[in-house]
């Protein structure tokens, strides 16, 4: 625990990782990191960005609902975090990526038709936040050619796109596969 895994080596005795040997493992990372450990995944995905723009207004500022869809040019979802803090979520490639943080915050304030500027703002951008869910994308199963190694993550096959629910279901499926001893541990 607390150690970044830089590689793994399947051996007859188990899976060798950072000086340790394990009967089986779950690779539970984002696909771009899983590809470093399991090279067959390395080039399988394109990625989409997500940004969250926090806008702090006066404490009495509130939306009509705690979560609402925004139909403006940039904002998609607005979450009222209480006490005047709004979180604007933007996902997928768009014009917003070219805007500086101050410009993006100002554009969202204008879309929300707020009476004045926020007290402060903070923009968090993740360029590879999720894989691009394109039609007919080939998502890997949790099983790999080595039954002692299973995959978990929202990018693996599921009934859901890239969501937290998909990641949770994937993790459960991977754990159940190993708990069922489908990896044929050594005696």
Predicted segments with their positions:
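Short loop/edge segments at beta-strand edges and connector loops
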Residues: 1-3, 9, 125, 153
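Mid-domain catalytic core of redox enzymes
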Residues: 3-113, 117, 140
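Short glycine-/acidic-enriched loop or helix-start segments at secondary-structure transitions
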Residues: 36-38, 133, 161-162
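FAD-binding beta-loop-beta segment adjacent to the flavin cofactor pocket
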Residues: 124-158
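A conserved FAD-binding loop/helix module that cradles the flavin
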Residues: 156-179
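Active-site-proximal substrate-binding core of FAD-dependent oxidoreductases
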Residues: 179-187
């Amino acid at each position: 625990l607390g150690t970044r895994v830089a590689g793994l080596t399947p051996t007859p005795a188990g899976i060798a990782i950072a000086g340790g040997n394990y009967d089986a493992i779950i690779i539970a990372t984002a696909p771009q990191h899983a590809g470093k450990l399991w090279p067959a995944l390395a080039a399988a995905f394109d990625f989409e960005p997500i940004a969250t723009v926090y806008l702090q207004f006066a404490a009495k500022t509130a939306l009509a609902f705690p979560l609402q869809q925004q139909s403006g040019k940039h904002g998609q979802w607005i979450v009222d975090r209480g006490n005047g803090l709004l979180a604007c979520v933007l996902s997928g490639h768009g014009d917003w990526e070219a805007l500086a943080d101050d410009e993006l915050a100002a554009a969202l304030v204008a879309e929300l038709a707020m009476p004045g500027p926020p007290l402060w703002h903070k923009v968090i951008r993740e360029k590879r936040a999720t894989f691009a869910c394109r039609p007919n994308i080939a998502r890997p199963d949790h099983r790999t050619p080595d039954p002692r190694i299973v995959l978990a993550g929202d990018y693996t096959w599921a009934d859901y796109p890239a969501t937290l629910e998909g990641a949770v279901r994937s993790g459960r499926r991977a754990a159940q596969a190993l708990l069922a001893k489908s990896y044929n541990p050594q005696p």
